[in-house]
Amino acid sequence: MFKYFPTNYVWNLSVNLAIEMGARIGEIEEMCAPLQEAAKAPDAAGTQAFRATWAAMADKLCELAQEDEARGRLLSAGEKYGRAAAYYITCERLQAHGAPGRLALYERCLEVFSKGLRLAGDNCERVEIPYEGKVLSALYVRAQGVDGRAAPGRSPLLVQINGLDSTKEMKYRVGLPAWLARRGVSSLIVDQPGTGEALRLHGLTARYDTEHWASRVVDWLETRADVDPKRIGMEGVSLGGYYCPRAVAMEPRFACGVAWGANHDWRDVQKRRLEKEGSFPVPHYWSHVQWVWGAKDIDDFMRIAEDVHLDGVVEKIRVPFLVTHGERDSQIPLKWAHRTYDQLVNSPKRELKIFTDREGGVQHASFDNSINAGQYIADWVAETLQGRTA
């Protein structure tokens, strides 16, 4: 794990995530060098300072991209807009719920990200899935054939979902959809209830019965002529290590599942966090989880969290399932990966992969070095859904 700030895990997590999304080390230095003292400040003051330097860098990249556009250099402009979006979302996710300007910052990220995709000509399309009278926004990435072009006919697809505080743009830029596309597998990266646009723009909060929205996603995929409905899998990162196994257990149309970071008993994690055990993923943690889950107060949240566990659930999974975990995860103890794996008694192909110092990706959901872990997952999915690995 790259520890730019010696005493601030949350900020180091954010820097590492940004690097995984394509941040440049010179820009990291320019943004972070003025923040050494702010990193020691209370959450409110510190996160405002973090936002100021990171948003300024994103603004500068957008100005440079506009200069590229004016000269007809659209590919370069698209790359800069994409990197700017990564910096916007990095500082947005650290802000407190309701912080002045947070929503505008998020909307700016969406705008810049979309422009970056278009100008760069990326294999990525924004789509919307009807849900509860609103929509779940998602990014659709098409499988590639061996010649690098869009694969003909119906392709296997992996639905990819967020954790507690990630967004579809973050997951896209980390790289799993591109790695899958090269292996002949399409991707649908979803802002499910409690995350991204669903939470910020539509007020859709998280729910423990994830099959409620996951089934609607499968319904939508079954209408597409380029998706093989018999080869739809799901992957979840971080808290998605709860969301995904639950959905795969309860929605029989999923053909496989992957937990990128196990999260078997999130209710227990909350109890430990109340006792100051384990690392927090974001500042303002308790107000953040209440917002995500639509809780009135901390007591209401703890009641909601009582349902967020996989005991009695994982046994219902009857398709291949991969559980991965970082050996040095300081947010979610490794024991929960073993618990999920041990309860996958009815899966015809279960696997537990623990990432060690040798491979890298030892931190929570491999945020410290995602490429080896992510490509391991991509290979497993391709093998399971009949894509290709060569």
Locations of the language-model features?
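N-terminal cap/lid segment of alpha/beta-hydrolase-fold proteins
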Residues: 52-54, 58, 104-153
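Primarily recognizes the serine-hydrolase "nucleophile elbow" in alpha/beta-hydrolase
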Residues: 89, 220-275
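Alpha/beta-hydrolase active-site loop
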Residues: 204-226
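Mobile cap/lid helix-loop segments that gate and shape the active-site cleft of serine hydrolases
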Residues: 273-313
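Short beta-strand/loop motif that positions the catalytic acidic residue
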Residues: 317, 323-325, 329
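Short alpha-helix in the alpha/beta-hydrolase fold that links the catalytic acid
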Residues: 319, 333-343
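Catalytic histidine neighborhood in serine/cysteine hydrolases
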Residues: 341-362
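Catalytic active-site module of serine/aspartate enzymes centered on a nucleophile-bearing elbow/loop
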Residues: 367-390
